[in-house]
Every structure is written in C-alpha cells, then in structure tokens.
Regions:
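N-terminal active-site segment of His-dependent metallophosphoesterases
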Residues: 1-38, 175
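Short beta-strand scaffold segments in enzyme catalytic cores
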Residues: 87-89, 101-104, 140, 239-241, ...
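CN hydrolase (nitrilase-like) catalytic-core segments centered on the catalytic cysteine
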Residues: 66-86, 154-258
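Active-site catalytic loop in hydrolytic enzyme cores
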Residues: 63-66, 76, 93-178, 182-200, ...
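Short glycine/proline- and charge-enriched loop/turn segments
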Residues: 53-61, 123-124, 224-230
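A conserved C-terminal secondary-structure "cap"
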Residues: 267-290
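Cys-nucleophile CN-hydrolase/nitrilase-fold catalytic domain and related Cys-dependent amidase chemistry
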Residues: 17, 26-108, 114, 180-207
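Short, glycine-anchored, charge-dense loop/turn motifs used at functional sites
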Residues: 6, 104-112, 242-249
C-alpha cells in the first residue's frame, strides 16, 4: 500500500507579490499540518492575472528559475515541511524566450524539473500569446518522494493529448494550476464545462485529477500603457479533486480561500488501471499523426 495525500489551495491575488507569496505559504502550511504531502497552488499566484491586458513593461515580470521569488520561497517551505509543491511562475528562459512554467519542487526542497505550458490561449482578456512562448519541454512525469505526478497548466487541461501524454510517461496523479473565470464576451458560465472536461480526463486515464484555481475580481486600471483599457475578470474558484473514475471527491466554492485534500492508495489505483485494460487496448498505429 502506497498512500499519498494531495491538496489544492485556493486564494485571491493582490497587486503585492510579497503578500501573495506569504498567503500561499500560509495555506500550504495549513494543508501540510492537515496531512497533505503534495500541495498545488494556482497558476501565476505571485500576481494578479496580468494577461488581462497587454503591456510591454510586464515582460519584466519574467525571471529565471533561480531569481523567481515564489520558487525560492517555496523551495525553503517544501524542505521545511517535507512536502512537494508544483510552483507556477513566469519564466525568462533561454534565447530571451518567456514561458508560463511550473517548477516541481520535491520534499527535500530541490527542483526536480520544469514543465512549460504547451497550449497558449489568446482570447479577450486571456491574452497569453502576448506574454508566453509555447512550451518546448513536452509532457513530463516527475518522480517525487510521494508519487509520480504530471503537471499541465490551465489551457492545457482542455486538450486530451496533455493528459494522455503525461499518463504514458508514467504519471499516477495529474495536477493543473489554473486561472480561469468570467467570459468577457460570451454570456455563459464556463465552470461546469471546465470541470466536466477534466473529470472526463480522469475517467479516460483512470487517474485522479487535481485543479487549483484562484478567486476574486481583478480590475484593469486604464492607462496609456494599456491603451486605456478598462476591464475586469471574476475568477470562479471551484477548485476540486477527482478520483480515478472522474467522480469529484473534494471541491471548493467560488469565493472561499482555503484548501481541500484527499488521500489515495497508489497501488490500488495502478491495479484498477490494469484491470480496465485501457492502456493495453490502445491502438496508436490507427490514430494517425494528427
């Protein structure tokens, strides 16, 4: 029996980087005290979601791994608490390329590696192509102290190729740091669709999925640098954990800060995957290159 307890934290983000990092650390510490061993913060939690507007000066937010405040703070916290923390951050990579990345920090405080967001959205007030180069790491599985995990980032979660790619690499649990909320043009609530998409991924790959989203309304202040844009996004939280069949076993509401956690037996999950034969019966030679 290999039991692991996983958690997702949910919080609002202010314009104060230090305040956001301290808030995330406080929630991670509380989750660890409750027994969590792998703890997921939301996407780009250092700041408010700056991709809502286009400003050239925001490129300066990107830092190399070794210089990012959130990563360095979480490395120390992971070592202190003996927990795994996948940390989303704005990365200044090689060749002056800028990436939306996750550093997977193991329970000894060391970075196991980086995943760079593969699928980059470009929509009203989710203008990520302005800031991020599409990731070049490919889908990865990270062997942490407690489990082998896969990490996708927000828009990645809408693509079944992301999940299957991580599953084929050996992932046992899938983690998605997220920043998603109101649709500024479409008059719809995308939350149920967002959640169903990932519960389906869990069911089709027979492995738990964890999604951590932010909450709160974030407003853009009109100025010359953003062309006098005036807008706002309300992030709908609803962070959740599924079991291997896609059943939501833990969830949060749309407005509350805090964390959720759940325990799984990894040996039992592996046995269940084998008994269903989903990976045995794959026919990749029939799927084509596209």
């Amino acid at each position: 029996m290999r039991e692991v307890t996983i958690a997702a934290i949910q919080m609002s983000c202010s314009r104060d980087v230090k305040e956001n990092i301290e808030k995330a650390a406080k929630l991670i510490r509380a989750a660890a005290e409750a027994g969590a061993q792998i703890i997921l913060p939301s996407e780009l939690f250092e700041r408010q979601y700056f991709c809502q507007e286009r400003r050239y000066d925001y490129y300066d937010y990107a830092k190399p791994l070794s210089e990012n405040d959130a990563v360095q703070s979480m490395k120390a916290l992971a070592k202190e608490l003996g927990v795994v923390i996948p940390v989303s951050f704005y990365e200044a990579g090689e060749g002056r390329q800028l990436f939306n990345s996750v550093a997977v920090i193991d329970a000894d405080g060391e970075v196991l590696g980086i995943y760079r967001k593969t699928h980059i959205p470009d929509d009203h007030y989710y203008q990520e192509k302005f800031y991020f180069t599409p990731g070049n790491t490919g889908f990865k599985a990270f062997k942490t102290r407690y489990a082998t995990i896969g990490v996708g980032i927000c828009w990645d979660q809408w693509f079944p190729e992301t999940v299957r790619g991580m599953a084929l690499k050996g992932a046992e649990i899938l983690f998605y740091p997220t920043a998603i909320g109101s649709e500024p043009i479409l008059e719809c609530d995308s939350m149920p669709h967002w959640r169903r998409c990932m519960t389906g991924h869990a069911a089709c790959n027979l492995m738990p999925v964890v999604a951590a989203n932010r909450i709160g309304t974030e407003e853009v202040v009109p100025c010359a640098e953003n062309g006098n844009q005036s807008s706002a996004l309300t992030f709908y939280g609803s962070s959740f954990i599924t079991d291997a069949t896609g059943e939501v076993v833990e969830q949060m509401d749309r407005v509350t800060e805090g964390f959720i956690l759940h325990s799984f037996d990894l040996d039992e999950l592996e046995s269940e995957r084998k008994s269903w034969g989903l990976f045995r019966d794959r026919r990749p030679e029939m799927y084509g290159e596209n």
